[in-house]
Amino acid sequence: MSGREGGKKKPLKAPKKQSKEMDEDEMAFKQKQKEDQKAMEQLKAKAAGKGPLTGGGIKKSGKK
């Protein structure tokens, strides 16, 4: 090994794996995840229109 041939012999990035065929369980799981994400975004949008949750009741000044 001479001085010019130092360093890593392996490439830094591993080659990408080929996309495998998904079976029925994986397809159903991915579909369920997409539906859950859509539902969460709808709930977030609905909740964003409302004001803060707290704010009712008697406010105390903190003075004694």
From Swiss-Prot:
The keyword Coiled coil applies. The keyword Coiled coil applies. Residues 21-50 form a coiled coil. Residues 1-64 are annotated as: Disordered. Residues 27-44 have a biased composition (Basic and acidic residues). Residues 52-64 have a biased composition (Gly residues). Keywords: Coiled coil. Signal peptide: none annotated. It comes from the Eukaryota. InterPro entries: TMA7. Belongs to the TMA7 family. This is Translation machinery-associated protein 7. The lineage of its organism: Eukaryota, Metazoa, Chordata, Craniata, Vertebrata.
